[in-house]
């Protein structure tokens, strides 16, 4: 499987990307159109581009939003992207019924009003929701267990699309299966809509614990694991060699405070998704800024202290103890 050779190369690609964005904004201010040949000749859909784009989001926060106002708050707070939904995961859990892709009109409105990347969720196995999002022009598609799956046994073949996909995973086999299907980015599933980061912690420790075990083993151990997971040997071998997943890996599921975000970064996340934790809180602007600060500077305790002081526990979303949920109420078990 072809992947970008090194994360140093991805860092340079990210720097180039931001320079191009600055140039684009300067040209817009001067009333000059963006040179057409650059957009026409872009290598859309290649593995290098699809894996490279998420790498530009490292140390960043992608926030769930349901409208333009929330998207603008996220952008002002420093989010590296927004994820457009019809309902926030907390509300999806409360509402029940069938959760589907957000309205295309809302997605287009958000795209028209912010300059950061715009993502949206599709139901597991729903090819046509993904086709529609690709046609609309989103930057990233999340094949998400938060929405009601249309196929309990099969995920989307993501190699068919030019848009990069992100998928959730609870353990290493699940993550590698999604990558073998073409996922350009992995996130922990956690337990969305609970404001409880415990499951995300469990999933990250499971994934990286298994990788550490593989890295300490021999080739036969890698082959056995590949057979067990039903994924290519080369993918498992690459993961063992890198001692991490070969794609960008974000934390998601229950992140509600700056300390939660810093914890997940400390456990090895490249960045975080925040779902209900911001816009189901009483202080969304301050909390968004604080989580962005803590994520970007997780390895500087003084800055994380500063970020944590920006919010109050009294303003946090009301969390749900996962131990009180019935098995059929768990979202993380959707997908295989």
Swiss-Prot record:
The active site is at 121 (schiff-base intermediate with d-ribose 5-phosphate). Keywords: Lyase, Pyridoxal phosphate, Schiff base. It comes from Pyrobaculum aerophilum (strain ATCC 51768 / DSM 7523 / JCM 9630 / CIP 104966 / NBRC 100827 / IM2). This is Pyridoxal 5'-phosphate synthase subunit PdxS. GO terms for biological process: amino acid metabolic process; pyridoxal phosphate biosynthetic process; pyridoxine biosynthetic process. NCBIfam families: PRK04180.1. GO terms for molecular function: amine-lyase activity; pyridoxal 5'-phosphate synthase (glutamine hydrolysing) activity. Pfam families: SOR_SNZ. D-glyceraldehyde 3-phosphate binds at residue 205. Catalyzes the formation of pyridoxal 5'-phosphate from ribose 5-phosphate (RBP), glyceraldehyde 3-phosphate (G3P) and ammonia. The ammonia is provided by the PdxT subunit. Can also use ribulose 5-phosphate and dihydroxyacetone phosphate as substrates, resulting from enzyme-catalyzed isomerization of RBP and G3P, respectively. Its EC number is 4.3.3.6. In the presence of PdxT, forms a dodecamer of heterodimers. Belongs to the PdxS/SNZ family. D-ribose 5-phosphate binds at residues 64, 193, 254, 275-276. CDD domains: pdxS. It is an enzyme of class 4 (lyase).
């Amino acid at each position: 499987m072809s992947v970008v050779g090194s994360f140093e190369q991805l860092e340079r690609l990210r720097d180039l990307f931001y320079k191009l964005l600055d140039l684009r904004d300067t040209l817009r201010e001067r009333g000059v159109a963006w040179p057409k040949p650059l957009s026409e000749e872009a290598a859309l859909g290649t593995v290098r581009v699809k894996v490279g784009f998420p790498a530009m989001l490292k140390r960043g926060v992608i926030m769930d939003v349901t409208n333009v106002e929330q998207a603008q708050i996220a952008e002002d707070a420093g989010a590296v992207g927004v994820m457009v939904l019809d309902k926030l995961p907390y509300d999806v859990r409360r509402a029940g019924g069938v959760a589907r892709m957000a309205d295309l009109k809302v997605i287009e409105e958000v795209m028209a009003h912010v300059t950061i990347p715009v993502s949206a969720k599709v139901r597991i196995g729903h090819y046509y929701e993904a086709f529609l999002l690709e046609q609309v022009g989103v930057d990233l598609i999340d094949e998400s267990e938060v929405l009601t799956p249309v196929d309990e046994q099969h995920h989307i073949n993501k190699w068919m699309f030019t848009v990069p996909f992100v998928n959730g995973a609870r353990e290493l086999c699940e993550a590698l299966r999604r990558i073998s299907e073409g996922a350009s980015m992995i996130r922990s599933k956690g337990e969305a809509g609970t404001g409880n980061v415990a499951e995300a912690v469990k999933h990250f420790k499971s994934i990286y614990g298994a990788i550490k075990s593989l890295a300490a083993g021999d080739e036969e151990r890698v082959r056995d694991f590949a057979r067990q997971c039903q994924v290519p040997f080369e993918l498992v071998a690459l993961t063992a060699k890198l001692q991490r997943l070969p794609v960008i890996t974000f934390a998601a599921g229950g992140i509600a405070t700056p300390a939660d975000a810093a914890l997940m970064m400390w456990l090895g996340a490249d960045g975080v998704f925040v779902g209900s934790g911001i816009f189901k809180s009483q202080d969304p602007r301050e909390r968004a800024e604080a989580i962005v600060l803590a994520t970007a500077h997780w390895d500087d305790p003084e800055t994380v202290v500063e970020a944590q002081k920006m919010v109050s526990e009294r303003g946090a979303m009301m969390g749900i103890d996962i131990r009180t949920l019935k098995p059929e109420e768990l979202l993380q078990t959707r997908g295989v």
